[in-house]
Amino acid sequence: MAHQLKLLKDDFFASDQQAVAVADRYPQDVFAEHTHDFCELVIVWRGNGLHVLNDRPYRITRGDLFYIHADDKHSYASVNDLVLQNIIYCPERLKLNLDWQGAIPGFSASAGQPHWRLGSVGMAQARQVIGQLEHESSQHVPFANEMAELLFGQLVMLLNRHRYTSDSLPPTSSETLLDKLITRLAASLKSPFALDKFCDEASCSERVLRQQFRQQTGMTINQYLRQVRVCHAQYLLQHSRLLISDISTECGFEDSNYFSVVFTRETGMTPSQWRHLNSQKD
């Protein structure tokens, strides 16, 4: 068995007193599966890629938010102008009297829901705080670590305020059409999605929305929906005993033959080959 790559805090933190730092990925390249001896928050700003977290694949794009525990294993593949930031932290070094465990999913163990979404409002506010945090955590002046931790606490609370599950925006949300579209697509795993109907409901131009989506994500709307469905199929093939025909239906494909064609084109192997190969990991 190949040796598991592990990223070490000594390579990312300026001292053993530093609790928080920011690691930019402009852009994020393909990165082999790895773990850490620190934790991280991952926020995606634009582009797209495949993020595999604890053997579960996610097609990620702008607004995706992940809480990664040190023991989690993850990797990045099939990246396309993927821009993200990692806010890395050492739980045992945090001194601020905050309910970190209540505020950060999986703070003390690899558990809880790791994947969330941020809309444009939350992203804008988070970007501002992260900019301050990045500046403060790189300073070699008195109280820089304390200031960085205060900003990290502010960021954590801000994310709590603005995050939502990938397929469910709050009903009172003031997020942009693009945020609402991505949420609607995530909620359309099993059912057909009609862009013209969505645009009618939102009173917006289909052409403009298509352009906006591609500009921010690097994909067409159909490509994104297809890849989200394939990611879900990969997860079900590995972690369930459903028949391939049933998985096809669960992932929004009315015809299992067409599902097999799409799956093979996206992954390079048939659903049955993929299931056989990945069942050996469990």
From Swiss-Prot:
Keywords carried by this UniProt record:
Activator, Cytoplasm, DNA-binding, Repeat, Rhamnose metabolism, Transcription, Transcription regulation
Task: Tell me the GO molecular function terms.
Answer: DNA-binding transcription factor activity; sequence-specific DNA binding
One Pfam family from the record: AraC_binding
Task: Report the domain of life of the source organism.
Answer: Bacteria
DNA-binding region of this protein: 196-217, 244-267
In chain numbering, the residues marked as site (Interaction with sigma-70) are: 246
Please describe what this protein does.
Answer: Activates expression of the rhaSR operon in response to L-rhamnose.
Q: What is this protein called?
A: HTH-type transcriptional activator RhaR
Organism of origin is Shigella flexneri
Q: What is the lineage of its organism?
A: Bacteria, Pseudomonadati, Pseudomonadota, Gammaproteobacteria, Enterobacterales
